[in-house]
Amino acid sequence: MPELFDLEDLETNSALPTSGLIAITMDSAGVAHFAIPRAEVGQGITTAAAMIIAEELDLPLSQVDVSLAPARPELVFNQLTGGSNTMNSMFTPIRVAAAIARGALLQAAALELGVALSALTTRAGVISGPGGVSRTYGQLAAKAASATTRAVSVTLKNTSAFTLVGTPQNRVDALAAVTGQKKFTMDLVVPGALPTMVCRPPTLNGSPHGSSTSPRSG
């Protein structure tokens, strides 16, 4: 049977043109930050994205911070959340972004330590070289940073070498959720906004006859 081009494929393909615009940043404490341009609605995409980044960056999961990105017009359809498509369409782009970040850190380490790039290894957020020399990702973050967007080649980790992706992990937002610290849409406070209720007609194809701004009594 030939493969069918379905809604899942359509969503994935519509996100591809802007997938190269997502990026990962590293701070001086060695924490990787990523703002995912999709909606976390309980399906666990922030945890999944953090696991992918930690895997590709050779970084402990505890040192990855995934937040929800604000609306970015330039991302167009890369902000669509639906059809169980987020991880299908973002798995590789997130891996690529993490691999690019790792490559930049390795290049910075090679320059700072004065050793060949091929002589360096990464593990748990530390780059090590010959003779025991090493630098943490945090120490190299500023030197590895780039303010420009350019095409680069990247080699992804072989899936057979995965140690985190595919393993059971606690949700990164679980503690905040059960202790009342997690913010939901209902927690949003908009200055000057008034309570609103959606009114639906009791019949099919019903329509309102009028409206009033006068306060209701009773």
List PLM regions with ranges:
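Cofactor-binding beta-sheet edge motifs in enzyme active sites
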Residues: 1-218
